[in-house]
Amino acid sequence: MEKVPEKITLGLLQHACDPNPAQNLDYALNAAKNAAEAGAQIICTQELFASQYFCQSETHEHFDLAEPIPGPKTTAFQELARTEGVVIVASLFEKRAAGLYHNSAVIIDADGSLLGTYRKMHIPDDPLYYEKFYFTPGDQGFRAWDTAYGRIGVLICWDQWFPEAARLTALAGAELILSPTAIGWHPAEKDAEGKAQHAAWQTIQRGHAI
């Protein structure tokens, strides 16, 4: 691994998702390219960027959105990482085997190599967040990967509410933890609970840093 620079520039991608997965992929790739050209060295997509958040219902047809890792989306981000010389963390709906699906993220180094995959461990099952219908909890533990710009770990969305997830990732040597997220509020809760929940989230993240 090359000497890690003292300062790292992050590119964090966020966008409204179109019903067309191909359009979302094109948007994310273009946004990542723009971020790289603006100086980003590590780029992270939002959680499940390639589709609208489908876990609001339990619908079997949504499994068609999943793809293997590596697959077409992984390959597209590998090519971008290699061309732009950036590290990329991209969140994907993974089809691991027949009947076995994960909410995953691929970790791609600046030379385009696929370093590994993180699979979301903590899976919510609340009104409008029926993720247990779709995702099997990850079975790889909490890990970290050496990249061109430091040793990074990955958590996904609800994982970041659990202190031990960040602690174990840090114990694996992570200098930076990235958390692709599609977090939100139930519409009936946002006005009454939104500010308090946001403050609680900030407190949790500060605890992770400590």
Task: Kindly give the residue locations of the regions a language model identified.
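Short glycine/proline- and charge-enriched loop/turn segments
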Residues: 56-64, 126-127, 186-193
